[in-house]
Amino acid sequence: MALKDTAKKMTDLLESIQQNLLKAEKGNKAAAQRVRTESIKLEKTAKVYRKESIKAEKMGLMKKSKAAAKKAKAAAKKPVRATKTVAKKACTKRTCATKAKVKPTKKAAPKTKVKTAKKTRSTKK
């Protein structure tokens, strides 16, 4: 199928789905079933359309319309804000040395387990 045929098929399916949805809202069970089946057909057709459109883009068959081309040019002409870059001051020996020094943290003393006396059984007979 050509890209145009696929697009036409998709629009026809969308229109019929829309009509059947209106009928299904009123309680028509057959229309509800048609909506379900046509939505599956639409899904498959959309998959084919995606493949064809990618193929057409690669071959250069898809052309931008004049209005879309003008919008793209207008968007390109907008001035871009320059981001300010803040220059870092050169490190002097004092500032770099103080930043580089890390104060050692005190380690907590290891906890020792408290020994408990073992209970012995009395062996009275």
Swiss-Prot record:
Signal peptide: none annotated. Belongs to the histone H1/H5 family. HCT subfamily. One of its GO terms (molecular function) is DNA binding. The gene is hctA. Keywords: DNA-binding, Repeat. This is Histone H1-like protein Hc1. Residues 98-125 are annotated as: Disordered. Residues 100-125 have a biased composition (Basic residues). The keyword Acyltransferase does not apply. Transmembrane segments: none annotated. Might have a role analogous to that of eukaryotic histone proteins.
